[in-house]
Each structure stands twice: as C-alpha cells, then as structure tokens.
C-alpha cells in the first residue's frame, strides 16, 4: 500500500513520540550493556566489579545475577582499560583508605553536593548514615548549608573539602588541621576521595544516570 504524505507525516510523529517516551523512561546517554553483548574486555571488567567489595556494600549498580552493571560502571565499560585502572583506585578510596569510613563518606557527600550529583548522593547518603554520620548534618549539607553540630573531625573534613571544591586551593589552617589529625597520608587520601568523586560526579551527570526505583532526587537546587 502506498503511504500518502499525511500518513507519512503521522507515522513520523508517532515514531518521534515513541522515541521521546523511550528517552523519558531511560534518560541514560550511555545505555546499559547486557552481559551477553559485552566484549571480552568489558566482561572481564564487569566480572571483576562483581567479585570485588562493592557488592558487599549493597550497591544497586553491582548485583550478582543481574543482566548488567549500573552506573558509573556501565559508563566505564566504554573504555575497558581505563575502567580497570579506575577500579583499583576506587576500591582503595572506598575500602582501604586511611580515613575513617564515616569521614570518607562525608567527604563524598560534600563532593556530591558541590556537583549536584543526585545519583552519587543517593548511593552514598545511606552509607554515610550507616557509618555514623548524623542525619541532621547530611540534611543541612543537602540543602547547601554549612552543617551545624559537626564534631571536630567532621569540621576538619568539611573545611578542607569545601575549600578545595569552592576555591580550588586550601588555606594553611585547613591543611594543618588535616595533617595534624590524620597525617600526610590522610591528607593525600582526603584529596583523592574528593578528586575521584568529582570524576564520578561528572560521569553520572553527563550520563544522566537515573535513580534506582524512580526515587525522588534528594538534592534541591542551590540558590
């Protein structure tokens, strides 16, 4: 049957509508790659993630038996060699850092707030609270406020991280406070967790990674 101009136009509109609906349902720019469609290098990386400590943390992005892996790992798959190198860095920063877990997660939340990284905040908020961060401190931070009621260590971490993100340098006072409390290794590990999660924030924001289960974005816009 010959398709007339009007019908052709209608079909085009339907197609465009369907494409828009699909995009709305899955806003990811880097679409999920099922295990069955991964290259050998991608599969090796994905298997390594699933065999690592991320799974035990309860990450929704790394679930044994799932059809694929989620963000940011799904994005890293596009560059398997980079992905494998970042995996070692990420596992050190998450699980082997010299900083106490609560403070490490607090620094991640500071980074997520600065970058408006909804997925990153969603993933690490529960980990920070589980590690002992006061929910009121997290709530104030989410609202773009300097949290009231921080203990001495939290204040040191916040001051250093906030200065680093907002001014791109740190004052002598902020630096000295970190080194005096956590040593030079602690200072380097604190720089590293802030820096690595800037990368993660960039990955997630560029990808437009959706929150699991259609969760509401936890971070309000900053004024």
Predicted regions and their residues:
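Sec-dependent N-terminal signal peptides
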Residues: 1-5
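Mobile cap/lid helix-loop segments that border enzyme active or cofactor-binding sites
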Residues: 10-99, 222-223
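Mid-length scaffold segments of soluble, non-membrane domains
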Residues: 99-140
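A contiguous pocket-lining binding segment that forms or flanks enzyme active sites
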Residues: 131-160
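N-terminal hydrophobic signal/anchor transmembrane helix of membrane proteins
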Residues: 83-87, 107-123, 188-205
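Acidic/histidine-rich alpha-helical segments that form the ligand environment
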Residues: 151-191
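Acidic, carboxylate-rich catalytic segments that either coordinate divalent cations
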Residues: 178-179, 195, 203-223
């Amino acid at each position: 049957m010959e398709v007339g101009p009007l019908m052709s136009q209608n079909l085009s509109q339907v197609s465009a509508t369907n494409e828009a609906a699909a995009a709305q349902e899955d806003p990811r720019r880097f679409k999920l790659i099922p295990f069955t469609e991964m290259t050998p290098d991608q599969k090796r990386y994905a298997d390594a993630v699933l065999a690592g400590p991320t799974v035990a943390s309860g990450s929704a992005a790394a679930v044994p038996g799932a059809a694929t892996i989620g963000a940011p790992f799904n994005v890293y798959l596009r560059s398997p060699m980079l992905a494998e190198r970042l995996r070692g860095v990420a596992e050190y920063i998450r699980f082997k850092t010299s900083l106490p877990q609560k403070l490490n997660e607090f620094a991640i939340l500071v980074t997520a707030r600065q970058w408006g990284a909804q997925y990153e905040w969603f993933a690490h908020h529960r980990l920070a609270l589980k590690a002992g961060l006061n929910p009121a401190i997290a709530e104030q931070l989410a609202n773009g406020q300097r949290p009231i009621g921080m203990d001495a260590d939290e204040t040191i971490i916040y001051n250093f991280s906030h200065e680093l993100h907002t001014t791109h340098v740190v004052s002598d006072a902020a630096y000295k406070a970190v080194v005096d409390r956590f040593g030079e290794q602690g200072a380097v590990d604190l720089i590293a967790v802030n820096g690595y999660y800037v990368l993660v924030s960039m990955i997630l924001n560029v990808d437009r990674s959706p929150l699991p289960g259609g969760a509401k974005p936890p971070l309000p816009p900053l004024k």
